[in-house]
Amino acid sequence: LRILCYHGCALDDEFLFRPGLFMTPKTFENRLSFIKDQGYPVVGLGEAVENLENHNLPSNAVAITIDDGWYGTFKHQYPALRQHGFPSTLYIASYYMEKQTQVFNVALAYVVWKSRVQAIDFSALGFSNIESATSTDDAVDSLCKIANSMEG
């Protein structure tokens, strides 16, 4: 059994921002076409587990899972999976569903990545640790810590 785990399909340029997290819809479609063209049987994850226990799993079986539940999953991945007739399992980040909010650290990192600003001065808010950030990742980590300290 091969379990293929995906995250999100880009709505815009997210595949450039985090290529390990987002791919283009075309890349996802190409992968599904490859699976179909090669004749790999695609089974749902529950069916795969059941068939493993019963020693009845088809040879070269593939299960497809998608993590996080980004909008691109609904817009691009779900229709492509339906078109190919492939079952899949979606794992939702339930914390963010319950809070009805974005995955803050990823959203913030994307905004910083898209920004053309070279420096951000938060000294008026009493925070100076952004000035010492040596990289974008350090700046995002610092901003997340600031935001988390403001949660009430």
PLM regions with names:
Residues L1, Q100-G152:
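Extended, charge-rich helix/loop segments that form flexible
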Residues H76-S94:
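A short alpha/beta connector and helix-capping loop motif
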Residues G8-D12, A48-E50, G69-Y71, Y95-E98:
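Short, solvent-exposed loop/turn segments at secondary-structure junctions
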Residues L4, I35, D67, L81, ...:
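Conserved, mostly hydrophobic/aromatic
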